[in-house]
Amino acid sequence: MAALLLRHVGRHCLRAHFSPQLCIRNAVPLGTTAKEEMERFWNKNIGSNRPLSPHITIYSWSLPMAMSICHRGTGIALSAGVSLFGMSALLLPGNFESYLELVKSLCLGPALIHTAKFALVFPLMYHTWNGIRHLMWDLGKGLKIPQLYQSGVVVLVLTVLSSMGLAAM
């Protein structure tokens, strides 16, 4: 808004042969400010008892929606995990072998180790397979609603199978 006003004033000054008194004398004051508009909007909504729009309770959860949220969550978690691992490798004393020996000395059962490995690899596999799904969308493939659900199920099955395979190693 201010840029438009400055452009108008500048053009008017150029037309008036750089006469500053004509520019100031013919300037049009603004009707309302953004703050006044915002206050009027919120007062109107509060007065009519409207909920915030769109209200979160009107959405029904669907597979593509849940998978999109989980894809973002796994991306954040993997990013944080890699950063935490890198910082701990730099700051903690000792080397990787000493920490591996520490874990081996705890005598954890194979079921617990397999479960922990599965829990570590599952977000990576989910983010990888769902990322490939997103790349297919970038190519314009699989964008129809039935295909969204089919590819979602394929991603979940591939995630579980590849996670189990990697955890078994």
Curated annotation (Swiss-Prot):
Record pathway: Carbohydrate metabolism; tricarboxylic acid cycle
Keywords of the record: Electron transport, Heme, Iron, Membrane, Metal-binding, Mitochondrion, Mitochondrion inner membrane, Transit peptide, Transmembrane, Transmembrane helix, Transport, Tricarboxylic acid cycle
Transit peptide start-stop: 1-29
Keyword Transcription regulation: no
Mitochondrial matrix side: 30-65, 140-146
GO BP term, pick one: proton motive force-driven mitochondrial ATP synthesis
Membrane-topology descriptor: Multi-pass membrane protein
Cofactor: heme b
Known role: Membrane-anchoring subunit of succinate dehydrogenase (SDH) that is involved in complex II of the mitochondrial electron transport chain and is responsible for transferring electrons from succinate to ubiquinone (coenzyme Q). SDH also oxidizes malate to the non-canonical enol form of oxaloacetate, enol-oxaloacetate. Enol-oxaloacetate, which is a potent inhibitor of the succinate dehydrogenase activity, is further isomerized into keto-oxaloacetate.
Official protein name in the record: Succinate dehydrogenase cytochrome b560 subunit, mitochondrial
